[in-house]
Amino acid sequence: MPKNTSLKKVLLIGSGPIQIGQAAEFDYAGSQACKAVREEGIEVVLVNSNPATIQTDPETADKVYVEPLKADIIAEIIKKEKPDGILSGMGGQTGLNLTAELYELGALEGVQILGTPLEAIYHGEDRDLFKKLMLEIGEPIPKSFILTKIEQLDEAYEEVGLPAIIRPAYTLGGAGGGVANTKEELRTIVEHGLTKSRVHQVLIEESVKGWNEIEFEVMRDAADTCIIICGMENVDPMGVHTGESVVVAPILSLTSDEFGIMRRAAIKIIRALNVQGGCNIQFAFNNGDYRVIEVNPRVSRSSALASKATGYPIARVAAKVAIGLHLDEIMNTVTGCTPACFEPAVDYVVVKVSRWPFDKFKTADRTLTTSMKSTGEVMAIGRTVEEGFKKALRSLDTDIYRHTDLNEIRMILSRPTDERFPTLFDAFRLGMTVKEVYDLTQIEPFFLEKIQNVVDIELELRDHPTEELVKTSKKFGFSNAEIRELTGWNIYKIESLVGLPTYKMVDTCSAEFPAKTPYYYSTWEQECELTQSDRKKILILGSGAIRIGQGIEFDYCTVHAVKSLREEGIEVHILNNNPETVSTDFDTSDRLYFEPMQLEDVVNILRKGDYDGVMVQFGGQNSVNLAIPIQEEIKLFGLKTKVLGTSPDNMDVAEDRNRFSVLLDQNNIPSPANGSAYSEKEAYAIANKIGYPVLVRPSYVLGGRAMELVHDELELQTYIKEAVRVSNTHPVLIDRYLDNATELDVDAVSDGETVLIGGVMEHIEEAGVHSGDSACVIPTQTLTPEQIATVKDYTRKIALSLGVVGLINIQYAIHKGTVYVLEANPRASRTVPFVSKATGLPLAKIAAKLMLGKKLADLGYQEKEISHVAVKEVLLPFSRLPGVDPILGPEMKSTGEVIGIDYDFGRAFYKASQAADNTIPLKGNVFISVTNDQKTEILPIARKLYDLGFSLYGTEGTVKFLAQNDIPMNLVRKVQEGSPNILDMIRALDVHLLINTPGDKNARADHLQIMRASIDYSIPYITTIFGAEAAVQAIESMKTNTITVEPLSHYHS
């Protein structure tokens, strides 16, 4: 039993939806913590609003609540469940903030705060308290000023000067912060920071921009035992958020004395905070001098990286410590024979590189500052820094543009952006020196020299290739494909020369002790540490870095597939490179490979491992794109491995527009008029034949990348170039646009003979908004029984015609009563977790068993009719990305999702909106501005809002139209008509809901300004008529009902 015997039941707060600054690392941390606490015989109650996480699976905790993460709702759960303790440190910034709020509400009476004490939360998050504590214990901090109102700005400016770094209190991933170089920038960032801070507090500190950034991950228990789990150094200097920076572990550029100084400081700080559990401490370092920058008294993104980098299960150990165990009483489950008080040792180099959404958002400001913009990250492991850098860049799976103009390179290097790290290689290719590059970037010369080493080998390979040099280049992380490109040699000659890589273990102890659950990375040395069993083995490809269009949903599917296969006695191995996820946890699979997910890396593992099968269905579009190449390589090398599930050729039928159209025609299934164009000329001819507007998109891409709705030939000219560039080996797909259609998503599984439909989801936004960005609902709300029957019939016909074995997602549109098929994806989709949580059907688990050859009839699952309503709503990243067009369209923009469950649509939609931080007000002022052709559609919505007691505001045209229909509305000036206008109302917080649909190009500028202001001031906004109708239903329902707060099992039973 744990030392704290008073604990019988513990509440764990999750982190909510995936968003910039808070990604899958908390799914991993919370899932590990639940397991760790339950092992000690303590009941766990979990609350989280994210349906896409393993954490919200019914089997993760004793009770799972998928409710909005709001203090009043959690207070109600506490009343109902009466937990003895609350674990706040596993839910990221959200968990800490909510714990502080619950305490301030008086909701934690009789509930122990475990692990991270309240004082530590306040000292770590409140900038003023943190500053006082550091001064008290004699730790140096940058000169700073704390303000709580904008009127203090002049005083702060006089005291701190410029440049200055702005850090709001209680915010996530540096939200609302930044670096100010002018007084105008200072005012803008501080105003924004004050609105983002929970306590309306901002720290302005002297800039230590250009200093090295060093981090320590520290663990402490109740007996005051402290250990350093991992030291990490940021390649990017201070001024760039650590979540954005390239990070290297272990610390390599400091002397042992310098390392020792900061190690002692880190231990002193965690003791002063009295944290029991994990803590992340960040320092700025410059020529022997250092400053304490910040403390995260919780599990963080850096903790996830440190955990995967060392193999030390930080979240698991932190949870055990929080419930009273000491480090020497906790076993390290990786070795199975050493206690958790042993500091990890590493004999390799780990590199983390972030992934940004700028391929989606061309207009976003790409400058990296103290406020995060990245959506995910990859981790690579090598024996050298050089190998780590090369493997990390390969793992990103992005196009890296080569710069050949020195002036352009100097400009890119002079400010931190997502392009700077790969451009360092270009600088050395063109002969710049380490000193020149350092002067522009302030990047530690140690790392610049490593990049120069890579470039030196690259240039030698190009100019003087030898067999010895080729072998050397492999140790520096070069792929065979790169070597072929540089040398011009035949790929088979290279492969026969270098052979296969060796695989080394990550085991927390540099192989001092035998490891029970190690994971592996490839390198080019003599001794291979892999061992083989005679069990049946399957390799599953993961989904890599979280990006828009390919999020945590695919990791959820991967983990479910692993669990399902292990139940069947299969030895399951995973290939993935995302350090944040549950799939890369030490004990999820029988073996984990931390590797790039390129064809060469996959095939090397297949050749080394004697696999019976490989599964590509669960890792999203990137894994599916490898299906045909993997099958060709399997034939080439004569391997026994099979690509399991739907055949790669049938996957291609679904992607190839012409082949798929033939299949639909054979089954008499309608689809919108469409065509495939291989050239611009063909595209114009197809679009003219179909008639504008048309949807144009490349094939074989995820998240609707480069998909656009184009209205005329001029727009097509602009967009077709982008689409062709994105997918130059595949045709561009052009479809008729079905305006005002109702869009549907269907997730199903098939064994090749029978089809089980998991759920039919109705989109709340109209067709034309990417399915990943639209809210959706199960069961459907407006479809007739005949339409539902048609959709199910078409789903069965398509799945069987495609020979689907496993999962399939099909998108439909209902236009003027006709059901049209838009597309089919015979793989895991981003809605699989939502459908599983809504219905209780574990679709990914079922699919994995079917891919083994089992039949649906033997598994005993049936389609489910549910009596409740589940709504999925999305989280959009616009508050993080200034300059981005916030209007939804056919290209996906959301980063994560939430779920709302209740017994009618209105309450479920209200809960989903609340969980997505777009809470619909139940009273106040509503601003309405719609296009002329939508005025009749807004009429019933405006009337209902007025009848519900709202005051309506609008511009002249809307006011006149509503007056003609006896609905009073207050007149507001348009933006270009001068003040006071709608922007002034937003800034004064005098408007509580905006319904503003985008108009033509002339009105769009106004619309964008209004949208941006509403985002900055956190005012809920709606941009479609369909969304406005749903909001009115929510308000009506909430006026007459209260929301239901029950565990997920209550709905499934």
Swiss-Prot record:
Gene name as annotated: carB
Disulfide bonds listed in the record: none
Domain MGS-like: 918-1053
Organism the protein comes from: Methanocorpusculum labreanum (strain ATCC 43576 / DSM 4855 / Z)
Single biological process term from Gene Ontology: L-arginine biosynthetic process
Residue span(s) of domain ATP-grasp: 131-323, 661-852
Name of the protein this chain belongs to: Carbamoyl phosphate synthase large chain
Binding-site list for Mg(2+) 1: Q282, E294
Region (Oligomerization domain): 398-530
Catalysed transformations (reactions): hydrogencarbonate + L-glutamine + 2 ATP + H2O = carbamoyl phosphate + L-glutamate + 2 ADP + phosphate + 2 H(+)
Gene3D superfamilies: 3.40.50.20, ATP-grasp fold, A domain, ATP-grasp fold, B domain, Carbamoyl-phosphate synthetase, large subunit oligomerisation domain, Methylglyoxal synthase-like domain
Binding positions for Mg(2+) 2 per the UniProt entry: E294, N296
List of residues binding Mn(2+) 2: E294, N296
Biological role stated in the UniProt entry: Large subunit of the glutamine-dependent carbamoyl phosphate synthetase (CPSase). CPSase catalyzes the formation of carbamoyl phosphate from the ammonia moiety of glutamine, carbonate, and phosphate donated by ATP, constituting the first step of 2 biosynthetic pathways, one leading to arginine and/or urea and the other to pyrimidine nucleotides.
Keyword line: Amino-acid biosynthesis, Arginine biosynthesis, ATP-binding, Ligase, Magnesium, Manganese, Metal-binding, Nucleotide-binding, Pyrimidine biosynthesis, Repeat
Binding sites annotated in the UniProt record for Mn(2+) 1: Q282, E294
EC class name: ligase
Sites where the protein binds Mg(2+) 3: Q811, E823
